[in-house]
Amino acid sequence: MTYGTNDKWNRHDCYCGKKGCIETYLSGPGLSKHYYDLHKKNLDAKIIQENANNGDDQALEFINEYLDYLARGLAQVINIIDPGAIVLGGGVSNMKQIYGNINSKLKKYVFSDTVNTQILKNKFGDSSGVRGAA
């Protein structure tokens, strides 16, 4: 799924060959690439999250911007399908900042005045996708 933007988060080609794919900026590797682009520090997503948890202003600002992009992507699903819940998976879904802040950000991008879709953390950790495919 693409989210065509002309801003600083739309710099990297996706492995599928397109530009603007959600994977290129919402995945852990995408998050790390964008952090490097902005701050010239090569940190993985887990370290960026730890820095934010420890009050690092640069990491906090970056995570806040990341959450805005996550909200844009989730809003596309909500606007089209209107699911009762969306369960997030993968390593980045372990970011505690997501679950406390995403609903206020979603309100900027959904068509409705309210957001009734629950954004949930998976129950089985990073192996949730594998379990779901089984």
Q: Which sequence ranges carry the predicted segments?
A:
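ATP-binding/phosphotransfer module of carbohydrate and carboxylate kinases, centering on a glycine-rich
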Residues: T5-A134
